Curated annotation (Swiss-Prot):
Principal subcellular localisation of the protein: other
Swiss-Prot/TrEMBL GO biological process terms: actin cytoskeleton organization; apical junction assembly; bicellular tight junction assembly; cell adhesion; cell junction assembly; negative regulation of cell migration; negative regulation of cell population proliferation; negative regulation of gene expression
GO cellular component: apical junction complex; basolateral plasma membrane; bicellular tight junction; cell junction; cytoplasm; mesaxon; nucleus; paranodal junction
Cystine pairings recorded for this chain: C54-C64
InterPro entries reported for this sequence: Claudin, Claudin_CS, PMP22/EMP/MP20/Claudin
Side of membrane Cytoplasmic, spans: 1-7, 103-117, 182-224
The protein, known as: Claudin-19
Length: 224
């Protein structure tokens, strides 16, 4: 029962992390224009993501444009794209395996050991999905930080962390935590000869052969 509860907790945590990974991948606010220094002179907020760039007017109107060329993109954007897409695919496969392998489902009840291994495989894939997301988000954030503190970067061209990065960090943490819980629910190994054998006692003293006593008395010549 304890393992079943831990599996459910891990599954819902990892599932929430996977949904967050999808949201982080789709959001265009991976970095946003900084309002430090003289950059506040403009009333337009700029956002850039993995798939598009957006401009937000002070009136609330937002205009987005998809990137025209794949090859013209920077290497870190292409790498982040690949890692996030791989994380989404791994999370989908992990979700299916976890549902099949959890004890609360009826699939594969005839083989509990194999069922537990399937659940562990799902947890491992959730871990990989979280690590891919963590790598992509942290790498992107590092480059944004380097550009921000680069003296050659104009003040009005500097960017800060966007909401998508924080969503990605939180989602990666949930996926890693949930996957760890699923991996901790290891199936108990089957014990050979688990059926107790009946106890056999040795032969009782009552079944032993009777001991014949020989008379050692000596009679005289007259039989007295």
């Amino acid at each position: 029962m304890a393992n079943s509860g831990l599996q459910l907790l891990g599954y819902f945590l990892a599932l929430g992390g996977w949904v967050g990974i999808i949201a982080s991948t789709a959001l265009p606010q991976w970095k946003q224009s900084s309002y430090a220094g003289d950059a506040i002179i403009t009333a337009v907020g700029l956002y850039e993501g993995l798939w598009m760039s957006c401009a937000s007017q002070s009136t609330g109107q937002v205009q987005c444009k998809l990137y025209d060329s794949l090859l013209a993109l920077d290497g870190h954007i292409q790498s982040a794209r690949a890692l996030m897409v791989v994380a989404v695919l791994l999370g989908f496969v992990a979700m299916v395996l976890s549902v099949v392998g959890m004890k609360c489902t009826r699939v594969g009840d005839s083989n509990p050991t194999a069922k537990g291994r399937v659940a562990i495989s799902g947890g491992a894939l959730f871990l990989l999905a979280g690590l891919c997301t963590l790598t992509a988000v942290s790498w992107y954030a590092t480059l944004v930080t380097q550009e921000f503190f680069n003296p050659s970067t104009p003040v009005n061209a500097r960017y800060e962390f966007g909401p998508a990065l924080f969503v990605g960090w939180a989602s990666a943490g949930l996926a890693i935590l949930g996957g760890s819980f699923l991996c901790c629910t290891c199936p108990e190994p089957e014990r050979a000869n688990s059926i107790p054998q009946p106890y056999r006692s040795g032969p009782s003293t009552a079944a032993r052969e009777p001991v014949v006593k020989l008379s050692t008395s000596v009679k005289g010549p007259l039989g007295v």
